[in-house]
Curated annotation (Swiss-Prot):
The active site is at C182. NCBIfam families: PRK05320.1 (NF003703). Catalyzes oxygen-dependent 5-hydroxyuridine (ho5U) modification at position 34 in tRNAs. This is tRNA uridine(34) hydroxylase. HAMAP family: TrhO (MF_00469). Residues 128-222 form the Rhodanese domain. It is an enzyme of class 1 (oxidoreductase).
Amino acid sequence: MQIVNISAYKFVSLNDIETLRPEMRSRCEDLELKGTILLAPEGINMFLAGPRESIDGFMAWLHADTRFADIAPKESLSDNQPFKRMLVRAKKEIITMKRPLIRPEEGRAPSVRPVDLKRWLDQGHDDEGRPVVMLDTRNDFEVAVGTFDNVVEYNLTKFSEFPDVIEARKAEFEGKTVVSFCTGGIRCEKAAIHMQEVGIGHVYQLEGGILKYFEEVGGDHYRGDCFVFDYRTALNPNLEPAGPKQCFACRAVVTAEEQQSPHYVVGKSCPHCVGRHDQAAA
């Protein structure tokens, strides 16, 4: 049976999480869905997987709530269920930045559609003639799997490092158009809002993130694959599972070439961590 995988988020004020959480969990369990839903005062972030009729049933139920009526999930298909259980969690933030919460009532960050971004990258500037800077807001191990050409990235180990890094370097973006991007849109939207707040003038988020870019325009101006947080590890520009895998011992991304190493033992070690294991055992 083919499994439909969806991801979606929305920054929207939620003040009824104690009621919403059990309702969502019950609905997902009734539909035999698996995955994770995060609820916070600033919004919702969800990753779900299940049969087509179950996914459609949940989205119809969700859209009946006017706060979520415009949520449009990104989809991909797999032969297996990528999640082991169904979790609905209450959090302080739907993506952790450890800065003041997003205020949804003040509006979203400006966004650029994938087709428009491709045009900018094709022509070498935005529609007003400003140079375009592609800013990767993901963690370093995700960037290693694939990213846009000529990207700016800061070797982040966690997203909460982003504010301090960007505030120290904001002068580098003067006179340029900055397009922040991430896997599905949530981190780059929060990053874009923060950049506006610290005075960076021309900031956009990539609408729908890398996965939406793949879906609408393919892999132009992008090199490699896109890391995803489930058993597939990475998707190529055709939104198909790609070669890299994740080491369950150290969480490093293991390329197809590295998987040929004798140090790569599924569930035990990989070339990135085998030496550390040996030292720990000594």
